[in-house]
């Protein structure tokens, strides 16, 4: 696992964007696994800047998102489809038909999950998977205690995750209780994984991910078993590392 410690969130975002940009330049038809949440927003802004300045071309890129809330349409302003459109896709030349997010309104969730995994397989897998870290160690919506081998599946969100996401909704009661998420098994199949984390609130999980015991109680520790992981964190998130 490669570790890069940056001064602050802004620098972390720039370093992460540069890492992804280099992979896109090397392979214009790259399949990117993308993440949502507060952490990647700065990185996405930097990718948009690079695109606007003619440094990047997304026209042949395919993207696969990790997860989506169950019960929210893609037009809902808290859905992850809406997040991706607003924070990245609407501002670059990616073909929207090549951007995939689980369907939170799928009538048959099990079929949606199986179809999502089949789509990833048909594309030849994910070349570069971007991950944020939940404070409880979740990646995607793979919450503590779940089995590693699971493919894309329906999951119940932990209370800590619901509370962490409540800031994006009018009330905690509006936060969906279920989500569709790529499984840890699917994430681990990515050829390369890039993890980004910022702030003191992520310091414990960053330490566990780097050197803690591998356990499903902290899903991020599973990444120790992947052959090509780069962890990009700011000084606050790295403060417990020796």
Curated annotation (Swiss-Prot):
Transmembrane segments: none annotated. The keyword Hydrolase applies. InterPro entries: Glc/Gal-6P_isomerase, Glucosamine6P_isomerase, Glucosamine6P_isomerase_CS, NagB/RpiA_transferase-like. One of its GO terms (biological process) is N-acetylglucosamine catabolic process. Keywords: Carbohydrate metabolism, Hydrolase. The active site is at residues 67, 136, 138, 143. It catalyses: alpha-D-glucosamine 6-phosphate + H2O = beta-D-fructose 6-phosphate + NH4(+). GO terms for cellular component: cytoplasm. SUPFAM superfamilies: NagB/RpiA/CoA transferase-like. GO terms for molecular function: glucosamine-6-phosphate deaminase activity; identical protein binding. PROSITE patterns: GLC_GALNAC_ISOMERASE. It is an enzyme of class 3 (hydrolase). Pathway: Amino-sugar metabolism; N-acetylneuraminate degradation; D-fructose 6-phosphate from N-acetylneuraminate: step 5/5. Its EC number is 3.5.99.6. Belongs to the glucosamine/galactosamine-6-phosphate isomerase family. NagB subfamily. Catalyzes the reversible isomerization-deamination of glucosamine 6-phosphate (GlcN6P) to form fructose 6-phosphate (Fru6P) and ammonium ion. This is Glucosamine-6-phosphate deaminase. It comes from Clostridium perfringens (strain ATCC 13124 / DSM 756 / JCM 1290 / NCIMB 6125 / NCTC 8237 / Type A). The gene is nagB.
């Amino acid at each position: 696992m490669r570790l890069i410690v940056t001064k602050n969130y802004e620098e972390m975002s720039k370093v992460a964007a540069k890492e992804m940009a280099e992979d896109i330049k090397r392979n214009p038809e790259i399949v990117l696994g993308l993440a949502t949440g507060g952490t990647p927003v700065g990185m996405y802004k930097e990718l948009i800047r690079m695109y606007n300045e003619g440094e990047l071309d997304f026209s042949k890129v395919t993207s696969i998102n990790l997860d989506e809330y169950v019960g929210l349409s893609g037009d809902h302003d808290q859905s992850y489809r809406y997040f991706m459109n607003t924070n990245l896709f609407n501002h670059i030349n990616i073909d929207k038909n090549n951007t995939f997010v689980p369907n939170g309104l799928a009538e048959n969730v099990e079929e949606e999950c199986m179809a999502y995994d089949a789509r990833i397989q048909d594309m030849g897998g994910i070349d570069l998977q971007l991950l944020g870290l939940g404070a409880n160690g979740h990646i995607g919506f793979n919450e503590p205690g779940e089995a590693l081998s699971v493919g894309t599946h329906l999951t119940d969100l932990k209370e800590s995750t619901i509370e962490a996401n409540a800031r994006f909704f009018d009330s905690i009661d509006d936060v969906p209780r279920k989500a569709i998420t790529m499984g840890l098994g699917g994430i681990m199949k990515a050829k390369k994984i890039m993890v980004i984390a910022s702030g003191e609130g992520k310091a414990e999980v960053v330490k566990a991910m780097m050197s803690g015991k591998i356990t499903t109680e902290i899903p991020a520790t599973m990444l120790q078993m992947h052959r090509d992981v780069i962890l990009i964190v700011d000084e606050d998130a790295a403060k417990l590392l020796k």
